[in-house]
């Protein structure tokens, strides 16, 4: 018995997906409202595996959604708000058409519905951890809008809201010492904080003048900002209440107008808020003598207990001195050079959180004040000062304050003679910036702060002195793998066997070529002075022939004149080595017969490097041959997989080799400049 035939497009993939046009008709809303609703609800387009089946044979470009998602939107309360908004907009349009501007303003003020997203936040994030996991994009978007200028597309009210929410979040990070890492990149400054076990990473743009292009759809971005501001408001409230702070914190509008930023917010504990009236008159309160006597008695009992605890602690310390101290953090070291790198246990986060606690910083006018203030305070520093021109809220605005221990500057050192142009004696050493350094004060560049927090310790400040060549600023989230180039390690520890000698010979060849070019240029200058008809250092007539010769030589021998390893070249090398050994033995016999001493020439550096390279090239060829023999035992599928793996490894090795070669050139140039 044949089964019942099904109508095409009523089951399977065609039923699981729905086009955007059909979805808009089904919800009976406009396309902008549909986009806005999908952003609020977290519904995004889907890509079916077989578009032809879903679109019933059509190949036109179409946007698809899950049918269940659109069915889920049918019960959304915001649909009624959108329809009500549309109805009020029609009434306002008719009032404006009649010229009744007052009635239109009254209708907009009284009848325009207010869209609230509280229920959507609760639906999308059932737990607080879910909200923290989705906070990365929210913070990046809000920090971006907080630094944008107001325009027709971005109202100043939205920018002020983003600034308030982001600074409230920064205050929580400072109070809880949740900041872990930061990185200066081309896009902006990356921050990573750990809140309730969740790593949150966001991007803050640099404070340059932002120019918004005309190809940006601010309606879509504004919808995201509307949702993210609601989300961050919920998160800030939960975070503040979890540490016993009142939300929202007090806001000083006057300080904010003067550029106070973080200083414009005053945090307040719940106990202080409830007892604020009584705290204002603490001096007028009379002390109860009976209560004071009981408090003194309890304090005396606590002192006796403390003395006993101190004696017991001293006895325990004497016993511990006799034994080996095993309370330190264990370090897991690999047993073999090719073993896996084990994650090491870290020190207490409390020590890192108070990294800058004992110091007083002063920020120069040219450094990024907002980011440095946030980082320094997040890592325990309570005293950060800057020039009064940078804004309100500084610990001190006096650069000569004796309490300052560190000054962060980012000015290039003045060249000799620039600071004293009217000096009579040119041989006298000139004063460089800073003209008057304060004794006992450390001058560093801003990168010192970022590198210290990323490594979790205070680094040497002399490496970051003003005008010094800074160490490489590396991303704290990217760890170099085996075989990759690591700027922190010395070059000799990363180069494979024989590579240093090869680089040295190539550098010598480059220097020789450079000297030849210099000689040709000098000849051209001399010829130019004597005659105009000379080719000015260029071989004009023979250029075509040279190009042909070069192309032929490149085609025959490759870019470096290397034609590969074959049996004939190996045989020639063996014959030459045997002939050289025979001639050397013959000279030794002749010297022994005549009674003369054989003059042994010491090999040159180039010959030594060539011998070392030859040795390791031979070893490398043997390894490649063994690898090829092992490949022959693999199946075709595994051989293709191995080929893809080798392609990635070769690409990584080539990039690492280029970086090592570049570093070798830079180090040689630096050494030559120092010698000069």
From Swiss-Prot:
A GO biological process held by the record: maturation of LSU-rRNA from tricistronic rRNA transcript (SSU-rRNA, 5.8S rRNA, LSU-rRNA)
Coiled-coil residue windows: 298-327, 568-676
Subcellular location: Nucleus, Nucleolus; Nucleus, Nucleoplasm
Superkingdom assignment: Eukaryota
Pfam families listed in its UniProt record: BRCT (PF00533), Pescadillo_N (PF06732)
Compositionally biased spans, kind Low complexity: 415-427
Domain BRCT: 351-466
InterPro entries reported in the protein's UniProt record: BRCT_dom (IPR001357), BRCT_dom_sf (IPR036420), PES (IPR010613)
A Gene Ontology molecular function term of the record: RNA binding
Known function: Component of the NOP7 complex, which is required for maturation of the 25S and 5.8S ribosomal RNAs and formation of the 60S ribosome.
Family: Belongs to the pescadillo family.
Official protein name in the record: Pescadillo homolog
Species this chain originates from: Phaeosphaeria nodorum (strain SN15 / ATCC MYA-4574 / FGSC 10173)
């Amino acid at each position: 018995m044949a089964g019942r035939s099904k109508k095409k497009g009523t089951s399977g993939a065609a039923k699981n997906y729905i086009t955007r046009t059909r979805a808009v008709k089904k919800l009976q809303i406009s396309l902008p409202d549909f986009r806005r609703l999908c952003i609020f609800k977290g519904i995004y387009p889907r890509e079916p595996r077989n578009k032809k089946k879903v679109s019933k044979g059509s190949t036109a470009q179409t946007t698809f959604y899950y049918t269940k998602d659109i069915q889920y939107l049918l019960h959304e309360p915001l649909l009624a708000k959108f329809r009500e908004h549309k109805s009020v907009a029609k009434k306002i349009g008719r009032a404006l058409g009649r010229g009744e501007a007052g009635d239109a303003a009254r209708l907009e003020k009284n009848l325009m519905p207010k869209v609230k997203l509280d229920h959507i936040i609760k639906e999308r994030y059932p737990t607080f951890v879910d909200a923290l996991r989705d906070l990365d994009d929210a913070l990046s978007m809000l920090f971006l809008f907080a630094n944008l200028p107001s325009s027709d597309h971005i109202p100043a009210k939205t920018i002020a809201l983003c600034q308030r929410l982001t600074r409230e979040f920064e205050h929580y990070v400072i109070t809880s010492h949740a900041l872990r890492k930061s990185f200066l990149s081309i896009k902006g400054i990356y921050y990573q904080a750990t809140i309730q076990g969740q790593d949150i990473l966001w991007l803050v743009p640099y404070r340059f003048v932002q120019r918004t292009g005309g190809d940006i759809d601010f309606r879509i971005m504004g919808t995201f900002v509307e949702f993210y501001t609601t989300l961050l408001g919920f998160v800030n409230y939960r975070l503040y209440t979890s540490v016993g702070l009142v939300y929202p914190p007090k806001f000083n509008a006057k300080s904010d107008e003067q550029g106070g930023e973080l200083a414009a917010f005053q945090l307040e504990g719940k106990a202080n808020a409830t007892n604020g009236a009584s705290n204002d008159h603490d001096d007028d309160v009379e002390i109860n003598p009976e209560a004071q006597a009981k408090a003194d008695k309890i304090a005396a009992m606590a002192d006796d207990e403390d003395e006993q605890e101190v004696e017991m602690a001293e006895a325990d310390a004497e016993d511990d001195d006799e034994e080996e101290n095993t309370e330190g953090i264990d370090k897991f070291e690999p047993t073999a050079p090719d073993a896996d790198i084990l994650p090491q246990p870290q020190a207490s986060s409390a020590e890192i959180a108070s990294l800058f606690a004992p110091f007083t910083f002063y920020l120069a006018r040219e450094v990024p004040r907002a980011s440095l203030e946030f980082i320094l305070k997040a890592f325990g520093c309570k005293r950060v000062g800057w020039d009064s021109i940078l804004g309100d809220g500084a610990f001190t605005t006096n650069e000569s304050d004796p309490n300052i221990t560190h000054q962060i500057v980012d000015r290039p050192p003045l060249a000799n003679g620039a600071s004293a142009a009217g000096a009579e004696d040119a041989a006298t050493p000139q004063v460089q910036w800073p003209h008057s350094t304060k004794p006992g004060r450390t001058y560093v560049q801003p990168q010192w702060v970022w590198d210290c927090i990323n490594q979790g310790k205070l680094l040497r400040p002399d490496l970051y002195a003003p005008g010094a060549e800074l160490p490489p600023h590396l991303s704290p989230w990217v760890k170099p793998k085996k075989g990759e180039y690591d700027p922190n390690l010395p070059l000799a520890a990363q180069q494979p066997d024989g590579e240093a000698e090869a680089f040295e010979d190539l550098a010598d060849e480059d220097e020789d070529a450079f000297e030849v070019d210099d000689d040709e240029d000098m000849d051209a200058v001399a010829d130019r002075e004597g005659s105009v008809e000379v080719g000015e250092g260029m071989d004009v007539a023979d250029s075509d022939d040279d190009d042909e010769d070069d192309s032929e030589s490149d085609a025959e021998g490759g870019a470096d004149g290397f034609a590969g390893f074959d049996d004939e070249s190996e045989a020639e090398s063996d014959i030459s080595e045997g002939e050289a050994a025979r001639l050397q033995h013959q000279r030794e016999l002749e010297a022994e017969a005549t009674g003369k001493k054989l003059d042994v020439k010491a090999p040159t550096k180039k010959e030594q490097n060539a011998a070392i390279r030859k040795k390791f090239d031979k070893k490398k060829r043997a390894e490649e041959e063994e690898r090829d023999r092992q490949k022959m035992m693999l199946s075709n599928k595994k051989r293709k997989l191995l080929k893809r793996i080798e392609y990635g490894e070769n690409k990584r090795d080539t990039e690492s080799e280029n970086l090592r070669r570049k570093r070798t050139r830079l180090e040689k140039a630096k050494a030559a400049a120092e010698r000069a």
